[in-house]
A protein has these predicted regions:
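Charge-rich alpha-helical segments
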Residues: 1-88
Length: 88
């Protein structure tokens, strides 16, 4: 399994990986969410998330295992890569 050290912007809380991301505006935040939705669908692993204006809060957990799995670490890493494109 991945080490949390490989995801320095994520926190492990309540049996989930969690991260808050900020964007220039709502359009960038929503565009980011659309891009992540495509990644999540391909992986068949979907985040719990919320959006308020330019802020997106993400929570990743694997309900089947009752906690964090390799799938969560993999999706978190992919989310970080997508965020790099939007954080320019």
């Amino acid at each position: 399994m991945h080490d949390l050290a490989s995801l320095p912007h994520w926190q492990l809380r309540d049996n989930a990986l969690q991260r808050e991301l900020r964007f220039r505006d709502f359009v960038d935040a929503f565009g980011f969410m659309a891009a992540v939705a495509l990644c999540a669908e391909r992986a068949n692993h979907h985040p719990e998330w919320s959006n308020v204006y330019n802020c997106v809060n993400i929570r990743l957990t694997t309900h089947d295992t009752g906690g964090v799995s390799e799938r969560d670490f993999a999706l978190a890493a992919e989310i970080d890569r997508v965020y790099e494109r939007f954080a320019q």
